[in-house]
From Swiss-Prot:
Keywords: Cytoplasm, Isomerase. This is Tautomerase PptA. Its EC number is 5.3.2.-. One of its GO terms (molecular function) is intramolecular oxidoreductase activity, interconverting keto- and enol-groups. It is an enzyme of class 5 (isomerase). The gene is pptA. It comes from the Bacteria. Its main location: cytoplasm.
Length: 76
């Protein structure tokens, strides 16, 4: 049951763009995890730039740098 939780600065994506993004992400997950499409879920959470450090970096990125399989090219 892979679940992907995308956090990003706000983007003006329409429903078609969101659907395409989810399909692309799901395709990669299905290929690498040998999952079924019905098992994959994708969330898109838009976080204001001024809230990024408190809501994302301090809770999900910074404390878990050793666990990340793709590390960011920035620090806070």
């Amino acid at each position: 049951m892979p679940h992907v939780d995308i956090k990003c600065f706000p983007r003006d994506l329409n429903d078609e763009q969101k659907t395409a993004l989810a399909a692309d992400i799901a395709e990669v997950i299905i290929r690498h995890f040998n999952s079924k499409d019905s098992s994959v879920s994708v969330a898109l959470n838009q976080v204001q730039q001024e809230d990024w450090k408190a809501q994302v970096w301090d809770t999900e990125i910074g404390p878990k740098l050793d666990e990340l399989i793709k590390k960011p090219g920035y620090s806070m």
